[in-house]
Amino acid sequence: MGGILKNPLALSPEQLAQQDPETLEEFRRQVYENTQKNAKLTSHKRNIPGLDNTKEEGEIIGTSSTFLPKDTLSLKHEQDMLAKMTPEERVQWNQRNLAENEITKKQFQDIHIDEPKTPYQGAVDPHGEYYRVDDDEDEDNSDKKPCQVANDDIDDLSLGEPEFEIKENKQPDFETNDENDEDSPEARHKKFEEMRKKHYDVRAIFNKKSREALKDEDEDEDDSTTKEP
């Protein structure tokens, strides 16, 4: 027989007369079963409260990839159901997760982690207790600041007499260039011009490079002749 979209009333009177009552009854039963299956698939996908989400033996409920669009009546029914529910009823708790958490709490309720307290040191005050002298009975140091007391202790420290006498070198470590001091600005300028001319003398540089290259070639030839048997 036809599917759910088949409308037996659209048949002609002659066709209806040819169909027996058992065939019409079977068609209506199939339509009803298909409607129930579609309702269960939709309720399983949307998880609508108030609908029967039970799964019968041998019946396949929609998977996660199943999606059936809702009609206007289903949406209106769902909105009416949600409007009647209280905020507490709308909340859907994960009972399985709650039960697992309770079991975990019971298993680890006697376990305690003992950790030492983290040492805390506040801001250091230069005039605080960490900078005071241990000997509070010393009246001479009572009026001095802690840094002054520490400097006095260092000054009083003596390393003793040296084993060897070190002669002081009265001569300066470097020699002053008196010539540069005595030169006049004209002489310094003339010297600068000569040095610059020597630096930018291309011919002299080329001749120097040529002599160095010839010298290197001569050394290579001498090395090769000495290595021959």
UniProtKB/Swiss-Prot annotation:
Signal peptide location: none
Molecular functions (GO terms): enzyme activator activity; protein phosphatase inhibitor activity
Processing after translation: Phosphorylated by the cyclin-CDKs PCL6-PHO85 and PCL7-PHO85. Phosphorylation of Thr-118 inactivates GLC8.
Stretches with biased composition (Basic and acidic residues): 107-117, 164-173, 185-196
Pfam families from the UniProt entry: IPP-2 (PF04979)
PANTHER family linked to this entry: PROTEIN PHOSPHATASE 1 REGULATORY INHIBITOR SUBUNIT 2, PROTEIN PHOSPHATASE INHIBITOR
Miscellaneous notes: Present with 3440 molecules/cell in log phase SD medium.
Job description of the protein: Modulator of GLC7 type-1 protein phosphatase.
Protein name per UniProt: Protein GLC8
Organism: Saccharomyces cerevisiae (strain ATCC 204508 / S288c)
Gene: GLC8
